[in-house]
Amino acid sequence: MDENALSYAAFYAVTVSLVGCLLFQSNWNIWLCANFLGYCFAAGVMLAYRSDIYCSLGCYIALMSTFHYMEFLTTALTNPANLSVDSYLLNHSVPYGLAALASWVEYAIEFWVNSDIKGLRWFGASGIGVIVCLVGDLIRKTAMFHAGKSFNHIVQGTKAKEHQLITNGLYSYVRHPSYLGWFLFSIGTQMVLCNPLCLFAYIVVTWRFFAERIYVEEYILLQFFGDQYSKYQKSVPRTGVPFVKGFKNNL
């Protein structure tokens, strides 16, 4: 792609974003996030397709932008009442941002030391990582569709009228398929980037995060559904995240 083409593409991107902000003033932040993720996806695909040396980075960018955009779109389709700009999960938390930053720093340093180790190899760790990301994201989005209005990005302390216990579909195999999907996706991203240090760190940190979250969430679900959820725990003993047991009511 020559410089003129890049200039036209940049001009088009800025123009579309500005026009969108004017037309959708009340939802300008949602529009900008959608544009940002769309441009990131396009840039990622271009890198993956046109550059052997940056192929893994391009795949990573495309996968990340797809993950966050589909979080918003899936919420819009299944639970529009809870839809907001936060549904993109771009501003998930400070630790989430720092984890992403750490992976970019490791990639940059290792690429500078030896760029050959960062090339995408479809039968190597990076290629397997792409598959892990796709499978993980598919599991998560499928779980969101199965849960419908009962799914929320934030653990709810109060039971809503439409809140139901979902036990069919993926929930008949594991109790928290959405967390399983996200766990796999997060690990897969570091395999794509060939980041050995962050791969280990992501496994430890995300496992601990989901272990704590599942424990709290299941405590609340037992308050919401009582014996119904206790029986569900017994019929579906796996949480989805390896070695995470969740909260058990021993009374």
For each of these PLM feature ranges, what is it?
Residues M1-K161, G188-L251:
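Membrane-anchoring alpha-helices and their flanking helix-loop junctions
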Residues I154-W182:
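Active-site-proximal inter-transmembrane loops
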